[in-house]
Amino acid sequence: MCGIVSIFNIQEQTPELRQQALRMSQKIRHRGPDWSGIYCGGSAILAHERLSIVDPESGRQPLFAPDKKQVLAVNGEIYNHQNIRARFAGKYQYQTGSDCEVILSLYREMRADSDFDTLIYKGEDALHARISKMLEELNGIFAFALYDAERDEFLIARDPIGVIPLYIGYDKDGKVLVASELKALEGQCDHYEPFLPGHYYYSKNPGMKRYYTRDWFEYAAMQKKYQIDDKKKAEAQLKDAEPQEKAAVKEIHDALEASVKRQLMSDVPYGVLLSGGLDSSVISAVAEKFSSTRVENGGETKAYWPRLHSFAVGLKGAPDLAKARLVADHIGTVHHEINYTIQEGLDAIRDVIYFIETYDVTTVRASTPMYLLARVIRSMGIKMVLSGEGADEVFGGYLYFHKAPDAKAFHEETVRKLGKLYLYDCLRANKSLAAWGIEGRVPFLDKEFLDVAMGMNPVLKMCPDKTIEKKVVREAFADLLPEEVAWRQKEQFSDGVGYSWIDTLKQITASAVSDEQMAHAAERFPINPPQNKEEYYYRSIFAEHFPSDSAAKSVPSVPSVACSTAEALVWDASFKNQNDPSGRAVAGVHEQAYK
């Protein structure tokens, strides 16, 4: 994981502006503690804080084209970089072994087209199609800023789902600023906001524009493809789709295996986050399968590190820890169980909110143990981990999905959840780990895997009544896991580290925030007024760190049950008067639901 800061549309380069960029970059140095770099030229400044994962020796950034006419700052990993390099053999002289350098070659190819300049004047559609084509060639997680010094133009882009964070801001002088975390922009801009996933910003046609589009964004395409009978209820739809299940299981198995294998590229020690739930257990088991050799050369040489290390965190006696140990013993990882106390968690919350830059209740709850775990992982020399984020959004794994009335409601909710993931679990996983200089990779959100998983018949993902959630994933990988884990009910990470963690947070915040404060919450916080005392408590800390309106607007604040969107609250009458993100809020489904 790295950190980037860039300033564009500079009218005059000055020593003061360079120092401003350096100060901004220093605020995110935790993301990239291995090296710092900066470029100042033309109308741009690009600064970079590096965490070296691939090509530690020569991959320092910013990266330059062979003739120095283009410069690039990237936070991310391009998993198909070897294929792109092969395509440019003899046509582009790469300067480093960095996977991210392929972005420069793709940009140069695009810009070298004889008709590209005319596209700028032909109309937005033609220009948009050409830039989108370039960005679609990348399979990876990324946020980048590219400056073309020859033409004095720039291109900014973010990965399809928003695994890598990025923010964009504008100052009173017309400058455009981007940074990996909002703390670098706080106080520097008149306005800033999250840079949207799957979008780009091209200076010759300003504004964020979506390049990542898929047929599965719309349920109508899925309904037509699979001839789903929308007149039927969930149970009947599921019965109709049963003949397709076997093929779907194999497709998911093969696609996820390929995703994990792609994401194991690394020149430094790596591990896996193993919570003991289904998703992290599947990722860990598949990673263990390929970890003994280097995926970069097709498994022809042994891995630099002989054993895969797995990590779990929780309070003593937490439900996840025993299951994580069981999985680790089953698949053969070197397992590390990290215990923390409730007081240690409470003491960390102020720092956690500073690093993750949110006041969302679920995110703060889950980020705290992850933040504590990341510190231990880094102390052991691990710089990259694979994690299971995204599976619940893709496959409808949250317990409230049991209440989905039909395939249309189910599929549209998964699309909504994926579209908002950059504000929640992607943010948590990235920033909690990056606080200690660790990169997190998420195979369930791999672009090629998503085309398979989101393109499958949504009926096969449904879990009406007592049907177990994520059945297709369980069947695809049951042979790699202990049976009691393969068929274990979904447990949210913030619950699984220990129920007493959540219960104590509720008690502490309930006593720390008075009824009078809650009554006047909208006066103190007119933007997204806190909906409960726990959110008020976190919001107060957030406002101390980041007092601007832009910061407040960057965080979502919507009613939710068990991590649902607001739209899904109509699925069950019991959701109507609830606002609790815990899975225990789904009565009749969670085995230890609230009484």
Label each region the model flagged:
Residues 9-12, 367, 422-427:
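Short, motif-level signal for alpha-helix interfacial/capping segments enriched in acidic residues
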Residues 19, 98, 247, 251, ...:
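Generic recognition of stable, solvent-exposed alpha-helical segments in well-folded globular domains
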